[in-house]
Amino acid sequence: MDAAIQQKIDNWLNGSFDQATKDDIRKLQQESPTELADAFYRNLEFGTGGLRGLMGVGTNRMNKYTVGMATQGYANYLKASFAGEVSVAVAHDSRNNSRFFAETTANVFAANGIKVYLFESLRPTPELSFAIRHFGCQGGVVCTASHNPKEYNGYKAYWNDGAQLVPPHDKNVIKEVEKIASVDEVKWSGGESLIQLIGAEVDQAYIEMVKGLSVYPDIIREQQDLKIVYTPIHGTGITLVPQVLKQFGFTNVTIVDEQSTPDGNFPTVVYPNPEEKETMGIGLARAKQLDADILLGTDPDADRVGIGVKDNHGEWVLMNGNQTAVLAFNYLLEARRSKGIAQSNDMIITTIVTTGMADALAEGNGVKCYRVLTGFKWIAEMIREKEGKENYVVGGEESFGLMIGDKIRDKDAVSAVALLCEMAAYEKAKGRTLFEKLIELYIQYGFYKEDLISITKKGMDGQQQIAAMMEQYRSQPPVSINGSPVVQLLDYERRKGLNPQTGEEWTIDLPKSNVLQFITEDGSMISARPSGTEPKIKFYFSVKENLSNAGEFDRVNKALDGKIKAIIADMGLE
């Protein structure tokens, strides 16, 4: 075994670690040296979003010690950044060890003299963002790995606006965390009196905030019997979504029993991700059985929402995040216009890999559409930047996330579920489904279709392979894709844009990010982006055609599918 790895292992075996941890290390030495090497070959990186990794012993795993060291670094930065009393909010999801990690986090903060508002039990991530603003905290942490498989856990760090860390704070916190060289530098206990348990009072304030997002409460009264099927996929959504739907006025809500109990083993699914058809399978079956109007599913920390509706043939389909975002954007913008409350400085915000239909729709409604890097922290940063100058209405991205209004600063599946049900009620009152409304928007703004493929590369070699793929695209970018010339080559890492046809160059006015985009003459857009939280590289595809009428939908839909397949083949990604 590599000497540096062995040294780290010896440090844990001989250091101030509990006996169970040492026993687990010795067991791995005997039974799985390869797994042991992976657990210690690097330090689990405190990235710009915090920690995310497999649970277990070692420097490259989520455990008490890596969580404690991260919290000590973050605590040091908070105390250096704010004079006077510093306070934080701490929450967690339904994953195995999430409560333990949240309590560890709270204890370390308190031992550093920081006041802690700790949720008494599991709660949705968006409520953590809300709590930071509600209590006027300087920061916050939620222990969650969002939609990752059950073996994972994570630690997301937030700033005083309720958003995840952005520059300069993200890099500065990373530096402080990296300074913590040993678990002996962590203040583990003392200051327990600074921890205050929170729950029902914050829940009520949050629910009132969500109720205020309703656009047409009278429509809900007319359509209160809308048949809704909801699955929390063994996660935190169960703590708030049923209450919120009831408060909105919906009376016919069926919760999928098999997935209603919070359980970190996610026994009915492999990936607790509402983007996955298999994950939504039980919910789809229940929706069919009940002849429901709408199916909704939230991931374990209830920041992503999946939606099922009947298509133009009456068959149940799952909408993707782009379709959901477009429908929500349009609903809110049209409602503001029809109610006479639209403002000349209204804006929506989306991300660089989200459908181009967002821009077309914004233009059609006379509002600005800003594009930021992937992740809601960048949407939140843009809101902060434009505060007092422009009016934020809604933001969303392709990864099944929506953020409605500016009272919280992270994606929120709880408010999204409520709004999507209201949208379904609104369309039902007009005698159509959400899918039929989507087709109407395609006719108006163009038929945009997107797809995503993820290539997984695990372990030490995987990172190198992903880096090599990105370097290959950078050094030898395609001149044309599927027969259409590339007219924009966007390198967000270098913040450079280039038109290979004319030689024109420009600067991209966004922070650096390891993303490459190729836009072709026929309007196709291909984006390559290594995941920040999983051992994957993601390729996003967006294509477009005109749609003259609803009767042409199936033909054009099939043609767009063929176009995406041809692009994937042309890029050698089959």
Predicted features and spans:
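Glycine-rich phosphate-binding loop plus the immediately following alpha-helix
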Residues: 158-187, 322-345, 350-359, 413
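Conserved phosphate/anionic-ligand binding catalytic regions in large, soluble enzymes, centered on
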Residues: 40-60, 145-146, 232-244, 300, ...
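Short Gly/Thr/Asp-enriched flexible loops that form oxyanion-binding sites at enzyme active sites
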Residues: 101-109, 152-159, 303-321, 358
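Phosphate-binding and adjacent anionic-ligand microenvironments
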Residues: 288, 292-294, 315-317, 335-529, ...
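An N-terminal, well-structured beta->alpha segment
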Residues: 8-105, 196-224, 236
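N-terminal small/polar loop signature for handling phosphorylated ligands or for N-terminal nucleophile
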Residues: 89-152, 247, 251-306
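Gly/Ser/Thr-enriched, mixed-charge loops and adjacent short helices
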Residues: 12, 35-40, 44, 153-279
